[in-house]
Amino acid sequence: MAGLHSRLTTFLLLLLSALPAIAAAAPSSGCGKGPTLRNGQTVTTNINGKSRRYTVRLPDNYNQNNPYRLIFLWHPLGSSMQKIIQGEDPNRGGVLPYYGLPPLDTSKSAIYVVPDGLNAGWANQNGEDVSFFDNILQTVSDGLCIDTNLVFSTGFSYGGGMSFSLACSRANKVRAVAVISGAQLSGCAGGNDPVAYYAQHGTSDGVLNVAMGRQLRDRFVRNNGCQPANGEVQPGSGGRSTRVEYQGCQQGKDVVWVVHGGDHNPSQRDPGQNDPFAPRNTWEFFSRFN
């Protein structure tokens, strides 16, 4: 009987560990109130004496009583808020509008924020871009209904570096990040707390070498208590993406690494595929957390 009880307990623990990361919703102060921000609105604010801008995208039929997930989308160096909103030709290394995420959000579960960088980037001098994030999060939390446990961040290149910076400094605010071909470009204040972490990088990246992406990944493999992989996986035939799901991570602190044979490209496709895999992988990762 004791053996049966032990096996049953082990089975239940394994079953629970396989379930999606579900936490109680944490409705923001803007829930239950009329919205003070409208769909497509560009907001101007002041951070350390500098004028900053961001645009908000609300789902169709926004419901002030429904706590939405909030997703920050950071542009790469030389790009802009407007180029993330409108998109650029993915066949020439550009990004789909809003990084291709809204069409995958079939349940209309997310609000998107697209910030505009200083000098078209995220140098984050003296933490000013993290302060910008704090300002946006507070304004959106007060003016719209979000689940403050479901705040996410993604970006390509410099935008990936900014998402990594938030994973370091705002682990208590950000549920998960997706770093697309990123590097440590925007600093890493703190950097010792666990955050769910997705990253992808190309082995032929001539702008930010794949080793830079691996370095960022390894920080959160350690922080999240995951078992290190045995060696580095390589892209598949024809440069096809290869995916590693790290094992042994803390509950809800998953780490996923995708490596491909391409260059510095946010819209990399696998051979024979029409659509880039970053949007699908990012949305799948963020959707794990409810």
Swiss-Prot record:
EC assignment: 3.1.1.73
Chain spans, region Disordered: 260-280
InterPro entries, alphabetized: AB_hydrolase_fold, FaeB/C/D
Keywords of this entry: Carbohydrate metabolism, Hydrolase, Polysaccharide degradation, Secreted, Serine esterase, Signal, Xylan degradation
Superkingdom per UniProt: Eukaryota
Subcellular location: Secreted
Catalytic reaction(s) noted: feruloyl-polysaccharide + H2O = ferulate + polysaccharide
A single GO molecular function term of this UniProt record: feruloyl esterase activity
One cellular component term from this protein's GO annotations in UniProt: extracellular region
Gene3D superfamilies: alpha/beta hydrolase
GO biological process: xylan catabolic process
Signal peptide range: 1-25
Chief site of localization: secreted
Entry keyword tRNA processing: no
The family this protein is said to belong to: Belongs to the serine esterase family.
Role description: Involved in degradation of plant cell walls. Hydrolyzes the feruloyl-arabinose ester bond in arabinoxylans as well as the feruloyl-galactose and feruloyl-arabinose ester bonds in pectin. Active against methyl esters of ferulate (MFA), sinapate (MSA), caffeate (MCA) and p-coumarate (MpCA).
PANTHER family assigned: FERULOYL ESTERASE D (PTHR38050:SF3), PTHR38050
Protein name, entry field: Feruloyl esterase D
Organism per entry: Neurospora crassa (strain ATCC 24698 / 74-OR23-1A / CBS 708.71 / DSM 1257 / FGSC 987)
